[in-house]
């Protein structure tokens, strides 16, 4: 019998959660991560599954995700501990045939349950499936330090925030030309914040929760981690720049346009217009 802990998706989750912990983005039980799988991914590991998988109903049906398996982080679990005990901190779940709930096939031992942000993740998965024709498979939420810091000092406006991040590091426009969506402050772990995040995910692969953290979407764990890492690096630069008295010079609109043309991306118009 093949051991599921050696599968590419469990090993990928171990690396992503460990890297995020080492970055300082996921203190205590902060942050959550979900990866959409295919039946073929989990088929070799049926022998590892729980004999009687627990069933948990969703707070609202999600028929687009019917019969879809995911690997998810657990509620109240520490990213720093995933590498020590994957089965206690991660779970493979599969949405039922009508999208009304899911079974926990593997992991989440001792009656653990998936992240409290699962509604936000699943709703965002639905929108990114539609926005990318199924290419995006990962939703990652973390407490990226400098991005959070900027939400206290920048106007919480998509165009303003995006333009500042583009100017903070040349690669940003290339990596997220679609800009950064921003919500008002909302109570986490609710359907309301999940719906608001998913609405922004229709247009943006990055969504900021002011004074809290960031949501990112991508096709792979590496792409999603790299997306957040790139935005966070720019935020770190900006925090330093603002603390040194602000910008004396920066990347101009004309230079941003040239950058987009060189790399074949279309920058968010509202951010470019500032």
From Swiss-Prot:
Binds 1 zinc ion per subunit. It is found in: Cytoplasm. This is Rhamnulose-1-phosphate aldolase. InterPro entries: Aldolase_class_II_sugar_metab (IPR050197), Aldolase_II/adducin_N (IPR001303), Aldolase_II/adducin_N_sf (IPR036409), Rhamnulose-1-P_Aldolase (IPR013447). Its main location: cytoplasm. The active site is at 117. The gene is rhaD. SMART domains: Aldolase_II. Pathway: Carbohydrate degradation; L-rhamnose degradation; glycerone phosphate from L-rhamnose: step 3/3. Belongs to the aldolase class II family. RhaD subfamily. Gene3D superfamilies: Class II aldolase/adducin N-terminal domain. It holds the Pfam family Aldolase_II. GO terms for molecular function: metal ion binding; rhamnulose-1-phosphate aldolase activity. GO terms for cellular component: cytosol. Homotetramer.
């Amino acid at each position: 019998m093949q051991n599921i802990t050696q599968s590419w998706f469990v090993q990928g989750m171990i690396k992503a959660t460990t890297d995020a912990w080492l970055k300082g983005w996921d203190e205590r039980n902060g942050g959550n991560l979900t990866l959409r799988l295919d039946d073929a991914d989990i088929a070799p590991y049926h022998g590892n599954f729980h004999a009687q998988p627990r069933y948990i109903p969703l707070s609202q049906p999600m028929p687009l995700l019917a019969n879809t398996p995911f690997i998810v982080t657990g509620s109240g679990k520490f990213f720093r501990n995933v590498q020590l005990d994957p089965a206690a901190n991660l779970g493979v779940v599969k949405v039922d045939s009508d999208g009304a709930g899911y079974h926990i096939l593997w992991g989440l031992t001792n009656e653990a349950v998936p992240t409290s942000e699962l509604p936000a993740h699943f709703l965002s998965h639905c929108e990114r499936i539609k926005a990318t024709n199924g290419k995006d498979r990962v939703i990652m939420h973390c407490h990226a330090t400098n991005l959070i810091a900027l939400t206290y000092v920048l106007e919480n406006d998509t165009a303003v925030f995006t333009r500042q991040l583009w100017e903070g590091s040349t690669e940003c426009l290339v990596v997220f030309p679609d800009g950064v969506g921003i919500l008002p402050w909302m109570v986490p772990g609710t359907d309301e914040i999940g719906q608001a995040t998913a609405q922004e995910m229709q247009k943006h692969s990055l969504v900021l929760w002011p004074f809290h953290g960031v949501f990112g979407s991508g096709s792979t764990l590496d792409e999603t981690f790299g997306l957040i890492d790139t935005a966070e690096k720019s935020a770190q630069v900006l925090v330093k720049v603002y603390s040194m008295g602000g910008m004396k010079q920066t990347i101009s609109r004309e230079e941003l346009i040239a950058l987009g043309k060189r790399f074949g991306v279309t920058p968010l118009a509202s951010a470019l217009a500032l």
